Amino acid sequence: IENEFGEIGIDGGFLKESGIQINELNAGCICCSLVGDFRAALQQVVEQYHPDRIVIEPSGVGKLSDVTRAVEGVAEHLDVQLSSFVTVADVNKVKMYMKNFGEFYDDQISHASCIILSRTQNATEEKIAAAVAMLREKNPTATIVTTAWDALTGEQILKAMSTKDDFKAELIAMAAKANEEHA
């Protein structure tokens, strides 16, 4: 499901040519004006395709926290489970974006469960480390992927996206076991 704030979708044609089923929601944001359309689109995808995974690309103008709430609200009515919120950050512009976009960018970073750094293939180790440190200040728990685009596989991205859920499940299991032992 792709959400473009403008009236014309940018990526839809390319994705369709690649054989990816896409449902476009244009001229608004799924976290506010298009939430009803989003619910219908998500329900259609679930019922028609029965997918293992749905990728939702929101518009670039909504806060990730608002988008997350919209997705959670829709998910309450469907048999879907939220697993990951991914954002991409340009290794060369993290500092500038934090300064120029403030709350909007901070919200994007702080609510992501996985942050993929882009443009790392030409960045120095120092530049990457500095970007990671700035991101960690805003989000100490997110998985941060620094692998260069040309070396990054879809499998690696999926693993990074699911790491936190696996860790959370492991912690819950450990807590349950500890409670059983003390009962």
Which ranges hold each PLM region?
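Nucleotide-state-sensitive switch-loop elements of NTP-binding domains
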Residues: 1-98
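Charged, alpha-helix-enriched surfaces in structured cytosolic catalytic cores
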Residues: 29, 33-40, 59-62, 66, ...
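Residue-level signal for inorganic ion chemistry
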Residues: 4, 57, 112, 118, ...
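Short, ordered loop/turn segments at secondary-structure junctions
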Residues: 3-5, 120, 149
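Short acidic, glycine/serine/threonine-rich loops at helix termini
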Residues: 68, 99, 156-160
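Non-catalytic interfacial helical region
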Residues: 71, 92-101, 109, 115-117, ...
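Well-ordered beta-strand positions
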Residues: 84, 113-114
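C-terminal accessory "lid"/substrate-recognition subdomains
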Residues: 107, 111, 122-183
